Amino acid sequence: SCIPMLKRLLESQGVAMSKALCEHFQQSRAELFQIVASTGIRTFSTLIADHGTGTGCDICKPVVASILASTSSDHILDDETAALQDTNDHFLANIQRNGTYSVVPRLPGGEVTPEQLMVIAQVAQDFGLYTKITGGQRIDLFGARVEQLPQIWKRLVDAGMESGHAYGKSLRTVKSCVGSSWCRYGVQDSVAMAVALELRYRGLRSPHKIKMGVSGCQRECAEARGKDVGVIATEKGWNLYVGGNGGANPKHAQLLAGDLDSDSLVRYIDRYLMFYIRTADRLQRTAVWQETIEGGLDHIRDVVCADSLGIAADLDDAMARHVEGYADEWAGVLNDQEKLARFVSFVNAPDESDPTIAFDESGPRKVPLLLGMPGSVNAVESRA
């Protein structure tokens, strides 16, 4: 969207801009975060009754749902919070263009065992799913109907896998090269560090998605400087880069601190992420946050590395609570009949499947057919 750019342009010209989240909350996202964190409010209805107006909208409801998830270990489909989620979080999967969903199990650091590969392959074959390796070193399974998701995830969870959170505004992946274990150029064990970071920050809800990378040397095979948090090995330890991303407006991550030992590296990442989660605007990536926060990267460095605001212990404690309280979201669904009941195409006909879902398998790969959509009638004919 061009809205954030327009806001920054107007602000640079001295135009006073409202920080209100939407018509129902006059506070910014950061202000709402502080209200929730300081008051212990755990429901949207209480928050809007005490600090907002009306009944909410498609802007404020997902934002509040994210804030509630960032400040507790409650399941995102618990009680009234479930109704706040957008389409992807509502079914813990990414909706695709024909109404089916993708399934992405977590493969920490890109590691996967032969046994896990066999389970993934068998699941894909049994459910007729299209498979593809992602840019984040994971395996994506496409074409699952909503009612198939619990069946698919039960088999993956039983095999020791868990949600990869590809559907959420949260940590996605920690990409890594093979590092010093295998590569003759590697100076540190990048795989071990990537796995440790992914297991630490998995499930961490934030204003936008978070991607990380760990490279075992300066050759940068994991493309760490194109990530929100990038780690590059040195002979003395690790360089920490922050605020990178790809997408329509790619940004190179900037150096936050250099030659860190492993403990200091993790501590600084903890504080950086928690400071970002507390102060960023709605749907704001780390790169834009660094550019727009007062004082920029220098201020962030002072907060993270020098505790200039005196909140380092609080940030550390908040991350410790997240790590201790983490639970796999799909395992939580599989153990709860009430949550399982939502995975149907039609709530008034739970045993019926969506008849508009179809696929074209006549070409080199399986693709969705968009029945009832403009141009879909000739989709098969055009490939003949």
Residue ranges of model-derived segments:
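Flexible, glycine/charged-enriched surface loops at secondary-structure junctions
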Residues: 45, 62, 76-80, 129-135, ...
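Charge-rich, low-aromatic oligomerization/scaffolding segments with amphipathic character
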Residues: 3, 33, 59-62, 68, ...
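N-terminal basic/disordered segments at the start of proteins
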Residues: 80-113
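A glycine-rich phosphate-binding loop feature that marks nucleotide/adenosyl-phosphate handling sites
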Residues: 2-6, 173-177, 211-219, 286-299, ...
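Small-residue-enriched alpha-helical segments and adjacent helix-cap loops
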Residues: 9-11, 23, 27-28, 101-239, ...
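Ferredoxin-type iron-sulfur electron-transfer modules and their immediate structural context
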Residues: 1-39, 46, 60-67, 180
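Mobile "lid/hinge" segments at catalytic clefts and subdomain interfaces of large enzymes
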Residues: 216, 220, 225-287, 299
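C-terminal accessory nucleic-acid interaction domains of nucleic acid-metabolism proteins
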Residues: 284-384
